[in-house]
Amino acid sequence: MYFWVMFFTLMIKVKLYITNGDIFQNRPTVYVVYLGANRLKNAALASSHHLHLLSKVFTSKDDAEQSMLYSYNNGFLGFSAKLNSTQAASLAKLNQVITVFKSKSLKLHTTRSWDFLGLAVDNARRTPPPQLAYGSDIVVGIFDTGIWPESESFRETPEAKPIPSSWNGKCVGGEDFDPSVHCNRKLIGARFYLRGFEETYGTIDFTRDPEYRSPRDYLGHGTHTASTAVGSVVRNVSGFFGLGRGTARGGAPLARLAVFKTCWGKDLEGVCTEADILAAFDDAIHDGVHVISASFGYSPPLSPFFESSADIGAFHAAERGISVVFSTGNDGPDPGVVQNVAPWAVSVAASTVDRSFPTRIVIDGSFTLTGQSLISQEITGTLALATTYFNGGVCKWENWMKKLANETIILCFSTLGPVQFIEEAQAAAIRANALALIFAASPTRQLAEEVDMIPTVRVDILHGTRIRNYLARSPTVPMVKIGPSKTVIGETTAPSVAYFSSRGPSSLSPDILKPDITAPGIGILAAWPPRTPPTLLPGDHRSIEWNFQSGTSMSCPHVAGVMALLQSAHPDWSPSAIRSAIMTTAYTRDTSYDLILSGGSMKSTDPFDIGAGHINPLKAMDPGLVYNTRTDDYVLFMCNIGYTDQEIKSMVLHPEPSTTCLPSHSYRTNADFNYPSITIPSLRLTRTIKRTVSNVGPNKNTVYFVDIIRPVGVEVLIWPRILVFSKCQQEHSYYVTFKPTEIFSGRYVFGEIMWTNGLHRVRSPVVVFLSNAGFLASS
């Protein structure tokens, strides 16, 4: 027991994110050398050129070849290699090199959700639901920890159509993964990338480590996210030991799956290196994926966009018509910690669904309360306060008083200590040999649908206090009975934003709102490798095929599934049109018609919590108008973040003759980027911005009228106030003028702009930072 409890404690510590850095400081480090867009049609020629460049900083060509890890020669140009700082600096001075940066390590951001989003499979409609009508022509690439191919989620159905002719990818074999057996018309691609990881952390010993040198998944994260995005329809799923049973499927169950294993197990979590990530993007672009889902990132401070493999890969994917979706990270609820903030990808926050698992707590046969848990069978024992077993009543490993709590259920409070993570209290209870745990904490910071190593019922502070007071008054040692849990749907107000979901504003580009959208990310039940314990802990010997997971990692594939449906239904839409459809049709009110609440507090959400709102797949199918982003928007963005004309021409796939940072750009900020949201990062005097919309609705002749919710202290004027369309794909521009009417020394205020024609409501959130007090005083 001591061995795996130590691992349990380690899991708590790694939640705080291990500091990135060079593991071996006395040896060369892996660097990425980025050269821009790929206009060479010959991959061999590009690789030869990369080796030629690398040879400039080595004494021989052989040394250069041994140093190189990857040559990126499909979707973009560049390479990764083992270099010392002097060699890296020398390469950075070459004219054709845009950036050179160290390969950092990224971390993973780790059912009922699709019913909650309105995409039920079992319904009384005569027409098939969208996910059964669209998607078979779409390939979704999952960048994660691999795949468990035997899962029913990835089986080939008899009615599956042939693999799309546009597919250029392949299945790569390896340990316990045979492409002829494990790949089919559902799982059509599987690759794995290990060079960057092993150069950074050392060679994996696969004889001792449970990992696989193949696309096969051990950590479970990749299997879970793939199942969420595109899992086939699986009826009568038993769920997690009987909880959450029903029909399981992904958002686009007909879509094809391509797996890119970029992340590997280290210290009980998934780690992905930038060299490997960029190689996966390069292959995904070549292979012909339509959507990429990547649930990883790293905490701020964020690297510049073109010193980040994820952002570079996403940029070139978007230029080639591939939609990319990232998770925002699990560093909330503090503001300004949102990750993956590039404007050419979609960033997803996490929210709850309306499913709960109520668990009765009965003390002495009469005193009854209800908590939340995943307990499959009834548990009975004596009830005790934490003060009986832990110094000061603080449920932590180091506070144990070496008294055993045999057949005892312990009551712990998060506020004592405090106990930052519930896993701390669970590890302490296991060390004391407790039977179970009742954990009292703020309801806004509880994750009820978590798989526990020791049975744990979550209650709020009020209920915890009532239990404590009962104990204090009881003349005898109380007996308590808990469980089993039940599955209840539709009685919980939802959605609310997860407390851990990383919030805006963006620390890298505050004039682009991030996150973009919110999707389910708490208690998501999806496929799981049966050889992997549900908690990943060595002492956990349970085997399951479906597991609950929480995190923005889980919300990300929800959006990827919706993107696949939209791409299939509207094959002529660009990635920016798909993003726009998702954002402008999002909603901001919960099932009780109140504003969505922000977990971690009791306040209503603002755009920094939820972006444009909560995803609404059915509405996104027909948004009416979309905001398209074009090359000149990206050029404007790059000019404003400091890139030169020549660098921009190298990065953009099809540069126009006007691809240059003219002086006229000096007064245009990224607020003019044709984004579905509007952010003014510093409003002092009157400011006017421009947006352009395209008519993609079913009616070519239509008229849209504008409605405005003004931010506090800001006058908002829009011209024109009416948009008249006479054909499909017709574009119209409008201008928005912001003028402060009150004086603030620095405050964010929020509003929205909505265009409606009676059938469609095209909504854009507005964020304004008012900072006019000092400016007016100095004037």
From Swiss-Prot:
Enzyme superclass (EC): hydrolase
Pfam families for this protein: fn3_6, Inhibitor_I9, Peptidase_S8
MF terms (GO), sorted A to Z: serine-type endopeptidase activity
One Gene Ontology cellular component: extracellular region
GO biological process: double fertilization forming a zygote and endosperm; proteolysis
Residues at the catalytic site: D144 (charge relay system), H221 (charge relay system), S553 (charge relay system)
Keyword annotations: Autocatalytic cleavage, Glycoprotein, Hydrolase, Protease, Secreted, Serine protease, Signal, Zymogen
Residues in Inhibitor I9 domain copies: 30-109
Disulfide bonds: none
Record has Ribosomal protein as a keyword: no
Main location: secreted
Peptidase S8 domain sequence ranges: 113-621
EC number: 3.4.21.-
Protein localization: Secreted
Carbohydrate-modified residues: N84, N236, N406
InterPro entries: Peptidase_S8/S53_dom (IPR000209), Peptidase_S8/S53_dom_sf (IPR036852), Peptidase_S8_Ser-AS (IPR023828), Peptidase_S8_subtilisin-rel (IPR015500), Peptidases_S8_3 (IPR034197), S8pro/Inhibitor_I9 (IPR010259), S8pro/Inhibitor_I9_sf (IPR037045), SBT (IPR045051)
Propeptide: 22-109
Leader sequence residues: 1-21
Keyword hit for Magnesium: no
Family: Belongs to the peptidase S8 family.
Name of the protein described by the UniProt record: Subtilisin-like protease SBT3.18
Source species of the chain: Arabidopsis thaliana
Gene: SBT3.18
